[in-house]
């Protein structure tokens, strides 16, 4: 099965806090990709797994009587680790690649995910909502494959 990791803006770069509505954006993208026949690795699910792991850390709970809170690095590392099982990388609208350079206005997490996709040799695809119908799905970034390659097994 075709497995795609979806990436997109989570952090509001002006506040440093999670962007309002980020989870719904990822869930909508996942639903669309599943309809296209993909197995999807979604950061929303990874975040829940990380939080569950920390809530179930009984040693820490016994010592402190409070659950340990995951750090930003914990979330990012978990996402990067899960990318290793994917054969495609899809970026949501709002993540920009300019030529071979990652745009400076992206969060550290997205920058690292794009670099990891490159290291793993994953084709990088971009979702585009501006000027295209939503059901058009994913389009490739210039130089990173063709839509036919994305859709074939």
Spans of model-derived segments:
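Conserved catalytic or regulatory cores that recognize and/or transform ribose-phosphate-containing ligands
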Residues: 1-153
């Amino acid at each position: 099965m075709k497995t795609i990791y979806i990436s997109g803006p989570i952090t509001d770069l002006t506040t440093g806090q999670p962007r309002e509505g980020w989870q719904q954006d990822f869930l909508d993208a996942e639903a669309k990709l599943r309809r296209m026949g993909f197995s999807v690795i979604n950061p929303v699910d990874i975040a829940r797994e990380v939080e569950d792991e920390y809530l179930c850390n009984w040693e820490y709970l016994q010592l402190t009587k409070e659950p340990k809170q995951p750090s930003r690095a914990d979330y990012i590392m978990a996402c990067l680790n899960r990318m290793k099982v994917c054969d495609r990388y899809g970026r949501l609208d709002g993540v920009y690649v300019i030529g071979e350079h990652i745009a400076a206005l992206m969060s550290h997490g997205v920058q690292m995910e794009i670099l990891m996709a490159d290291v793993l040799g994953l084709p990088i695809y971009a979702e585009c909502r501006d000027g295209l119908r939503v059901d058009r799905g994913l389009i490739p970034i210039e130089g990173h494959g063709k839509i036919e390659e994305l859709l074939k097994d």
